[in-house]
Curated annotation (Swiss-Prot):
Pfam families given in the database record: Ham1p_like (PF01725)
Keywords: Hydrolase, Magnesium, Metal-binding, Nucleotide metabolism, Nucleotide-binding
Cofactor binding note of this UniProt entry: Binds 1 Mg(2+) ion per subunit.
Subunit structure, interactors included: Homodimer.
Name the UniProt record assigns to this protein: dITP/XTP pyrophosphatase
Binding site for substrate: 19-24, 79, 158-161, 181, 186-187
InterPro entries (UniProt xref): dITP/XTP_pyrophosphatase (IPR020922), ITPase-like_fam (IPR029001), RdgB/HAM1 (IPR002637)
Binding-site residues for Mg(2+), renumbered to this chain: 49, 78
HAMAP family: Non_canon_purine_NTPase
Species for this entry: Deinococcus radiodurans (strain ATCC 13939 / DSM 20539 / JCM 16871 / CCUG 27074 / LMG 4051 / NBRC 15346 / NCIMB 9279 / VKM B-1422 / R1)
Active site feature: 78
EC main group: hydrolase
Length: 200
């Protein structure tokens, strides 16, 4: 697999969004509208298990599998929250943290692990990989720093959003509208880089 870093970008009309996470699908579909790309779901495609040790590896695994299975360009995201006091955990394991099944349970577990820590600095990281059926890859990364709250705030977003207060914001990511979130979020930054690279 190669990473496409420069030169003219390819013309894309249809792209597969390689995720089963409905929250991510909503964010990506709306953000890609300026490109005029027709976004398609996975259909019957089964994504491989995330076995990579980095966000880049996990996103590439999913994007490449979807591109090869469909014959279309595929866009995948891998993201996570890294908490300084926990040595960067849960990181790439954010979606599988504690082997529990729901966002609420993962949030409760993270808060429990933070109970004795006063340093609540954290950051969200997102890596988008756009894979083509011929194996070429494009990577885009975004990060946002902030603080882990002592309890959830807001019911918007998904994942760890209700626990995360971005630096300079009075709203948690769980209290923001989708538009507010995309303007500052890790995924919003990665998407902005993709849009710029493709001329939007």
């Amino acid at each position: 697999m190669q990473q496409q870093t420069g030169g003219r970008r390819r013309q894309i009309r249809r792209v597969v969004v390689a995720t089963s996470n409905a929250g991510k699908v909503r964010e990506l579909q709306g953000a890609l509208a300026p490109l005029g790309w027709q976004c398609e779901g996975l259909g019957a495609v089964t994504l491989p298990e995330e076995t990579g040790s980095t966000y880049e590896e996990n996103a590439a695994l999913k994007a490449c599998a979807a591109a090869m299975a469909t014959g279309l360009p595929a866009l995948a995201d891998d993201s996570g929250i890294e908490v300084l006091a926990l040595g960067g955990q849960p990181g790439v394991y954010s979606a599988r943290f504690g082997n529990v099944n729901s966002d609420v349970e993962r949030n409760v577990l993270l808060l429990e692990k933070m109970r004795r820590h006063t340093d609540r600095r954290a950051k969200f990281v997102s890596v988008l990989v756009l894979a083509y059926p011929d194996g070429k890859l494009e990577e885009y990364r975004g990060e946002v720093t902030g603080q882990l709250l002592e309890g959830p705030r807001g019911e918007s977003g998904f994942g760890y959003d209700p626990l995360f207060l971005p630096d300079g914001s009075e709203l948690s990511m769980g209290e923001m509208t989708l538009e507010q979130k995309q303007a500052i979020s890790h995924r919003g930054q990665a998407l902005a880089a993709l849009l710029a690279a493709h001329g939007a």
